Amino acid sequence: MSFNANLDTLYRQVIMDHYKNPRNKGVLNDSIVVDMNNPTCGDRIRLTMKLDGDIVEDAKFEGEGCSISMASASMMTQAIKGKDIETALSMSKIFSDMMQGKEYDDSIDLGDIEALQGVSKFPARIKCATLSWKALEKGVAKEEGGN
């Protein structure tokens, strides 16, 4: 078995682990609430976040969807907790670039999120992977706009 095949297998295992055992599943009370959906495949997510100044104090999600969208939400909420908003948004940009097959800044450790790299080869699934990240961006914009 080649190195790439082993890596693909590992990445699939990481994705399935986050799908079957999602981190941060649930709802936060008194928080920023963002509902997003992907009409193409039916994925739905509700992201709830609490900020302490410019720090993402906590983030949880609930929803229904394919393994990629739910695993991505699990990975994202895990990755952004404790990060400042600027870093969280930078991670979102990096993830978006990765999904589009663009060169991306690898100076920020994405952790398990890198397991989703292979999704970029399947254009129909990119929206699944980026749904929770779009919710993050919308939530930050909502908070900064005071809505």
Curated annotation (Swiss-Prot):
CDD domains for the chain: IscU_like
Keyword Electron transport attached: no
Phenotypic consequence of C41D: Complete loss of growth without mevalonate
InterPro entries the UniProt entry points to: NIF_FeS_clus_asmbl_NifU_N
Reported effect, C41A: Does not activate SufS; dominant negative to wild-type protein, interacts with SufS. Binds about 40% Zn(2+)
Cofactor: Zn(2+)
Keywords in alphabetical order: Metal-binding, Transferase, Zinc
GO MF term (any one): transferase activity
Knockout or disruption consequences: Essential, it cannot be deleted. Upon depletion cells grow very slowly while aconitase and succinate dehydrogenase, both of which contain Fe-S clusters, have decreased activity. Upon depletion no change in reactive oxygen species is observed, while a modified bacillibactin (BB), an endogenous siderophore, is produced.
Group of enzyme by EC: transferase
Record's keyword annotation contains Transmembrane helix: no
Effect of C128A: Does not interact with SufS, does not activate SufS; no effect in presence of wild-type protein. Binds about 45% Zn(2+)
Pfam families in the cross-refs: NifU_N
Functional note: Part of the SUF-like system that mediates the biosynthesis of iron-sulfur (Fe-S) clusters. Acts as a sulfurtransferase and thus transfers sulfur from SufS to SufB. Mechanistically, the transfer from SufS to SufU is triggered by zinc-ligand swapping that provides a free thiol from SufU to accept sulfur from SufS.
Protein name: Zinc-dependent sulfurtransferase SufU
